[in-house]
């Protein structure tokens, strides 16, 4: 497993598009949650767009809790995603995707990030769009999520 992880790190440095990045799911990742959490943080801090995106997608796949991932939910995931989103479209979209999935699987953990306007405006907008497009987010949650954006834009208009 350690050799495959090392080869995966080399391969990730060569990835130059979101589709290839999002398809990578080395089986070795699902073996050790503590080690994977450390690796995800390193990928998020790498400064390489698709390595950061891979870290975000991996957090989404493995650390959002029951029914969605191999490991218990990590309450630090929302803050990690916001910090990693940056200014690049592909990393912001991955963070928005993670937040939309978080609103499905860990609603109480992720919703305050929207209601308290803790997301940068563009990431908030992208998250709302991804959540509204999702078939897994129930209609009553979609209504609440939609209102977070309406409230935010109305507050911005008043200033």
Predicted regions span which residues?
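Single conserved hydrophobic/aromatic residue that forms the stacking wall/gate
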Residues: 1-11
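HEAT/HEAT-like alpha-solenoid repeats
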Residues: 9-16, 40-45, 79-86, 111-115, ...
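Flexible loop/turn segments at the boundaries of HEAT repeats in alpha-solenoid HEAT proteins
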Residues: 5, 34-39, 64-74, 103-114, ...
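Eukaryotic acidic, Ser/Thr-rich intrinsically disordered low-complexity regions
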Residues: 112-159
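Glycine/small-residue-rich hydrophobic helix-like segments
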Residues: 86-118, 123
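A mid-sequence, solvent-exposed acidic-amphipathic segment
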Residues: 41, 45, 49-84
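Alpha-helix N-cap/helix-start positions at coil->helix boundaries
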Residues: 17-19, 49-50, 89-90, 121-125
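Structural detector for internal amphipathic alpha-helices that build alpha-solenoid repeat scaffolds
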Residues: 20-31, 53-66, 94-102, 126-134
């Amino acid at each position: 497993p350690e050799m495959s992880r090392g080869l995966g790190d080399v391969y990730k440095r060569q990835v130059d598009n979101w589709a290839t990045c999002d398809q990578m799911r080395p089986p070795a990742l699902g073996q050790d949650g503590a080690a994977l959490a450390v690796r995800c943080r390193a990928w998020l801090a790498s400064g390489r767009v698709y390595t950061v995106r891979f870290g975000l997608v991996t957090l989404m796949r493995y650390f959002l809790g029951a029914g969605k991932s191999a490991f218990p939910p990590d309450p630090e995931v929302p803050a990690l995603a916001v910090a990693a989103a940056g200014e690049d479209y592909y990393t912001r979209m991955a963070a928005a995707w993670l937040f939309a999935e978080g609103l499905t699987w860990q609603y109480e953990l992720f919703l305050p990030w929207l209601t308290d306007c803790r997301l940068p405006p563009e990431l908030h907008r992208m998250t709302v769009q991804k959540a509204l497009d999702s078939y897994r987010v129930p209609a009553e949650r979609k209504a609440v999520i939609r209102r977070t954006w309406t409230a935010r834009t109305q507050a911005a208009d008043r200033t």
